[in-house]
Amino acid sequence: MSPTSKIVPNIMCSITGNPKSGKTHLALTFPKPLAIFSFDIGLERVIRHFDPKDFTIHTYPMPITTSSKSKGLGKEIQAMWSKFNDEYIAATEDPEIKTLVVDTGTAVYEIVRLAKAAELGNESLLRFQYGDVYARMRGLLQRARVAGKNLVITHYLKD
């Protein structure tokens, strides 16, 4: 490391729990201001307990589907991924933002996975095609780390 390098301390945190167990509430207690990327319903229930000037909210309503495949949702999913990625990058570059909150990481993973399948013209991915999905997810973590932002990602427990 060169003598001019600056290490910016930050927190990388995953909060996992059952629905309505306080995951988002805990995330909103991190250093302000926050950029919230909400893929989950229920943010409105929690957000009213906090000062609205402390956060920027980006919402991404998940399409209703009965399949793990992107059948008929390709363009919609790709547009959602592109919008999220652009807004996430902008938040990491905003010097005012201290914390990024992704609610939920599970939803982001599904968006990334389905968007990649749509890019390839497929409804789903084969095992060897997940490299780009993992790279995109890793990129979200790395971008926050390099920018010196706190990153909080919520997840639901799975059976």
Regions found by a protein language model. Name each.
Residues 2-99, 107:
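Conserved P-loop
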Residues 99-159:
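P-loop NTPase motor core
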